[in-house]
Amino acid sequence: MEAHIESETIYSLSNFDRGAMRHLLTHIIIPDECLSAAGIDLTNLKDASPRYTTSVYSSLSVSVGVQIRQNATGLCSNWSNVYGEYVPSGALHSLLVPQVTNPAVFSTSNQSDQGALFISLPIECDSQNRFDPFTSVALRIPCSDIRTGDYKSYKDILFTQDELVPIGTRYNNDTERLQTLFLQFLQYTKKFESELPVTIIELGAKLEACIGNVDDVIHSQSKQFDIMHLLANNKHEFDTPDIAARIEADNTEIVQLIKKAAEAITKRAPVSGSLEKGSLGVVSGLKQGAIACLKNNTDLPSKNTQQKAVMNGLEPAGKIRFVGDGNTNVRLSSAMNHQLKEITTNFEDVLMFDSPSQKPVDSKEIFLTAIGILGNGITLANLWRCGSISIVTRVHSTTKSQFYIVAYENSVALGGRSSHLTPNPTSLNILLSIACQEEGVDHPCYLSQERKIDIARQAPILSDPLLREHNQLQAFSAGSEIDLMIDFKTHISNCVISAIGEALRMEPNLYQMISYHIHAYDLPFITEITNRTPNYIRATLNAISNSSWEKFSTGALISAAISYMAGYINKFGGKAYRRYTTENAAEHLGGDYQLVNTKIPGLVLFDYYSTGGECIKLNNRPVPIILNGGVDLWNRQPYNRSVMTCTFPEWFVPHATCEKFLPGESYAYICVGYDEHLHIAIVLPAGFMLTAHTEFNWPVARIEAVLSRLCRTNKMQQVLRPYVSEVYM
């Protein structure tokens, strides 16, 4: 929850409304199941040192990247870092159960409640509070661990804005949670009545007065609070804000009328101080005041008792109202003595007012006050926990796993009730659906030009997806972002395969380009490798072509392609792109390693493929190799090349088994290397090498669409505000 509070604080202090566009904030929780399905290694998160540690839960601070990606155009915002919080287990319980110093106050069951990441994301809206449902929000989570060392990696999770904005809130489903917390608190006060401060006992009595006679309920109430059970068994109904507001207004009016009646009664029957001590009693006051008075005050108060005390619900001992012969309002037995050992009737008052405030006090405010005492102060997190909370379950379109959208009663973010100036935004999907239905088409792209212009006039935010030529992504498609990256992987892989095929056609003979001493006992192995070389190369090319995006995104080819594309854009006066993880210049090969901040002569990044069994890529990061002594290595004429040696850079520390061998040093690997110009080197065992040059031709706009997603365009700031409208790249 601390991540939600911090993000909302930044959001509240930011100028998040600029011109025709504005940003709202939505709080989400991504459970372990969804994180795992997105490719996040939870071991790195669960094994990390906790940022917070309490008697109830611990959490880890996570720096997460956030980027808004426009529908169809390929334009996107700069990456911004926001604070996320990962709770290893019991995430929803940590959200919904107040944190106090004594864990015995609330009984919880965390067995089915997994860990989760708490994060807040921006929603882009127009001036009429409408959003494009196909605009995406990218969440980038760091994934580096001991196996990758200085190489920084990450995983992306994509959400469409339609996924992040539910049609309503579910505060009505939170009633059972609050009722359970109230009952557990009352059970705690009754069990430890003799040990707790009088203030806590009095607050417990106030709370009990608000919710009625709960003794039987407390004894029958289960000691376990299971939020997962509540989520699984809710009514799946959304709130009706108009009805709720009307009921609240009616209740306020009724309470004010009752208060006026109480004031009138007090004036007609003021406190009397003439009663004998032998008939000491407490009547006509509220139950919570009576308990404190009965237990702790057997002395007569001074005669100048203020009428304010009566209005606060406390009848001082010795001051009794409505007592006299034949008076039907007497509430205590006439046999009650000054020790007050027996109370023969119940105290029935249930309303209370705290002076000097004229606002009626409700059960949640009483509960919050008690939590503040039990928790050494009222924290903002406990303020939110003690109020109503809405949890809406959603299904992530990519992973098909559940995540939660959270709204807090005391929040100004999406679904919050603190600000009536920010109603929930509405989706433009309705406008598009009506247009498609009227014209009998199944996709907005097939609408007539006249209808597209009309929609763009009504909603300018849809103008580019509908009318702009040469969009880089498919318009109005939830999978367009994934399609762009798959298209990039496919295109660059095909370029590599074509280049290698052309090189083999031009020069089918392979030469030993890396110097290794071959002994006589190696000759049988060399002969066998020679016989298998065509199959090895064919299998390697198939592995490159069929590689998944997850494998491709951690390899040498994508890193070299980024260097090539960034250098190309920068050469012709475009943006200066930087590596996302390290802030190194993107055109520097190997810039994802922290220490590579300048160009290193002879550096080539390699991927290692297995020669035994299925041919698969083995490395989880590019393997940097420096080729020494090569003269015109990439020349197409082999007789112009010289034999060279290769070494690891001094800053590279191998971790995986394959990383401990240089290219050609082991019979177990075929190594494919790339430099910043997309030159290719396939190294077989014993140093035999095939070289090729990739011809990568892509439109500049498409290159920049990919680079703006994979890289940064400015240095990381210390204070980052992703919720401020900005110019798109």
Curated annotation (Swiss-Prot):
This protein's record includes keyword Kinase: no
Keywords attached to this entry: Capsid protein, Host nucleus, Late protein, Viral genome packaging, Viral release from host cell, Virion
Subcellular location: Virion; Host nucleus
Protein transport recorded as keyword: no
GO cellular component: host cell nucleus; viral capsid
GO terms for biological process, alphabetical: chromosome organization
Taxonomic superkingdom: Viruses
A Pfam family the protein falls into: Herpes_UL17
Annotated InterPro entries: UL17-like
Annotated family: Belongs to the herpesviridae CVC1 protein family.
Subunit structure: Interacts (via C-terminus) with capsid vertex component 2/CVC2.
Biological function: Capsid vertex-specific component that plays a role during viral DNA encapsidation, assuring correct genome cleavage and presumably stabilizing capsids that contain full-length viral genomes.
Stated name of the protein: Capsid vertex component 1
Protein's organism: Gallid herpesvirus 2 (strain Chicken/Md5/ATCC VR-987) (GaHV-2)
